[in-house]
Regions:
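Catalytic donor-sugar/metal-binding loop of nucleotide-sugar-dependent glycosyltransferases
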Residues: 133, 142-160
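Positions that flank functional sites
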Residues: 78, 139, 160-161
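Active-site donor/metal-binding and catalytic loop motifs
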Residues: 156-170
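Long helical/loop segments within the catalytic core of UDP-sugar-dependent glycosyltransferases
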Residues: 4-40, 53-135, 146-147, 168-208, ...
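Membrane-embedded multi-pass helical conduit in multi-pass membrane proteins
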Residues: 213-225
Length: 225
């Protein structure tokens, strides 16, 4: 980006938003407002990612299907060999993206992630952008797009890699955010998930059962009483 700006490429714009309202969702909505209205797709990549320069060219063809609103690549990681705990984290992530996402993709029910994701701009604007009140704005957006009839494509090819949490404390913060966000989504989308007005049975199944493990310990306590 710095090199392109230095060469006078006016298509490249950089914004630094410290302590922005709405956190990542708020920053993404800010960026969307400053994106060229003619842009057909919106790509989201986390700041710690190293991205293959051929990523966009490799996956953009899936948007030839006008029903596709999301094209998602795996959330892959690098530099995880430093400790046994980091290796275990990477193995867990790999299991989800190598196995779980394939099962969900068969039912058009993938979990959209906040990195290595490409979104059709028309679908994103139709959904009014990211929900700044949800702590997992990426997954919540994906579910809203499914509810609006859009489809998603999962491309199981690594086009970029980021960093795993640095230690156990960072891992706990990540899991707390995921668990809290899952409960927010279940509460806000309960009507669609239970009655399935616009969702298929497969989508309802995966989004309901996929988040039940977050409350598994509480259910074990209830069932043991």
């Amino acid at each position: 980006l710095e090199d392109r700006r230095a060469r006078g490429d006016t298509r490249v714009r950089f914004f630094h938003l410290p302590e922005w309202p709405g956190y990542k969702a708020g920053a993404l909505n800010f960026a969307l407002l400053h994106t060229d209205p003619a842009a057909a797709w919106i790509a989201v990549v986390d700041a710690d990612y190293r991205v293959d320069p051929g990523w966009l060219e490799s996956v953009a063809g899936h948007f030839a299907d006008p029903r596709v609103g999301i094209v998602q690549a795996p959330q892959a990681h690098r530099d995880w060999q430093g400790s046994l705990f980091q290796r275990m984290m990477n193995w867990e992530y790999e299991g989800f993206f190598r196995i779980g996402m394939h099962h969900r993709h068969e039912r058009d029910a993938i979990v959209q992630h906040g990195t290595m994701t490409l979104i059709r701009a028309a679908a994103l604007r139709e959904a009014n952008g990211w929900d700044e009140g949800c702590i997992v704005e990426d997954t919540e957006l994906g579910l809203r797009l499914f509810e609006r009839g859009w489809r998603a494509v999962y491309v199981d090819q690594v086009f970029g890699s980021g960093l795993v949490p640095g230690d156990f404390e960072a891992w706990c913060r990540q899991r707390q955010r995921w668990a809290q966000g899952a409960m927010q989504i279940l509460r806000r989308h309960a009507g669609q998930l239970l009655r399935g007005t616009n969702l298929t049975r497969g989508q309802r199944y995966h989004f309901l059962t996929g988040w039940l493990p977050w409350i598994g310990d509480a259910l074990h306590l209830v069932f043991s009483l």
